[in-house]
Amino acid sequence: MAVEYLKRGKPDAERAEDDAKTKVVVEATLKGIELRGDAAVRDLSAKFDNYTPASFKLSQAEIDDLIASLSDRELADIKFAQAQVRNFAQAQRDSMLDIEVETMPGVILGHKNIPVQSVGCYVPGGKFPMVASAHMSVATATVAGVPRIIACTPPFNGKPNAAVIAAMHLGGAHEIHVMGGIQAVGAMAIGTETIEPVHMLVGPGNAFVAEAKRQLFGRVGIDLFAGPTETMVIADDTVDGELCATDLLGQAEHGYNSPSVLLTNSRKLAEDTLREIDRLLKILPTADTASISWADYGEVILCDTYDEMLAVADDIASEHVQVMTDRDDWFLEKMTCYGALFLGARTNVSNGDKVIGTNHTLPTKKAGRYTGGLWVGKFLKTHSYQKITTDDAATLVGEYGSRLCMLEGFVGHAEQCNVRVRRYGGINVPYGTGAPYRDAKD
């Protein structure tokens, strides 16, 4: 495989060092929340957000006032985007069926899809108010039927952001708290004097929020590891450098540690894209962030063949993968490891982030190898059940169960089967033995 890097980002060792520092900070912060509750949350909010309201939880009157501050057009835009997310989530929900089957006479097996009973939705917004993240978590949880939805978002410029709060409320949040970072996800998962802990945390965030969710997993469920934004552009000479550069920088502006990768089989496109990035960084208002992100985490990878591009893409397993080639559907068919695909030059990651309807909370840091993104199914637990309705079935299944338990050395397990073989089948099975084999004529 001939793979050439025309530009590399930080070495993996340096990235791992950054992750290790984050882990230490998060661990200490979560311990403080567990020990000190609301007091720790208030101290952290004062330190990081310079925000100490009488109550972090918004009242209905405060929510109404914030929504009233938005224009009719702003509200219409929010409602349009939320409708697209709801429509797709509902279609996904409709595809998830409860089932019940009789696998043999008298044996009924089934499963039910039951909503998680309480969910904490984190909506990032300290640097940019992430209105769309409220649709992705809160509205999707509502479609799933979650009966208790808490939403948290940091203050923006020292106060609640009206658009984010409106999206949370319209999405169906039952409680809205203005707090961000580790303290928000920690309070929702651990609980405080004023916040009842949730069963599950969802939503994207910076490296500290993502690490906090990782450390809290087990105490609560999480949707997935959704850390700093990642984007990959897979392109050939059917598109130009301006388009590729725009798509790369459009995601690099998220934060200082947002990886952006161009994967191509065209040297000309690779070189043109590098020149276009230099040009665009001179006029991009968020260049102070995007330039650092591109310098430290940007990569341009040149391959000889489409098969090589596919192999490299699956190895990187990027969160967002923009495909602009003469064979977009081939990549859709062949790729196995990614967060979400954006197929064709008419499509772009920003549409997926904000309005098109698919969920933008997606796996990062190679998590796309083992999970997809947030969707309505993440809020549902599939629980199985079984029942035996006839004496014959209780006897037959019990006989096999008895012998298989004894094969593993579990006498107590076997007796659960044997007592039913005796009662419902009239067969004498001595205690501590497996059920006898029956001849075919029996």
Where are these regions (language model features)?
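N-terminal Rossmann-like NAD(P)+-binding subdomain of aldehyde/semialdehyde dehydrogenases
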Residues: 1-117
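Short acidic-hydrophobic, aromatic-tinged amphipathic segments that line or gate anion-handling sites
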Residues: 3-8, 175-180, 300-305
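Conserved small-residue-rich beta-alpha loop and adjacent elements
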Residues: 102-166
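Short internal beta-strands
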Residues: 147-156, 260-267, 273
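Conserved NAD(P)+-binding/catalytic subdomain of aldehyde/semialdehyde dehydrogenases
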Residues: 172-259
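A glycine- and small/hydrophobic-rich beta-loop-beta segment
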Residues: 254, 262-338
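C-terminal core of ALDH-fold dehydrogenases
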Residues: 306, 314-439
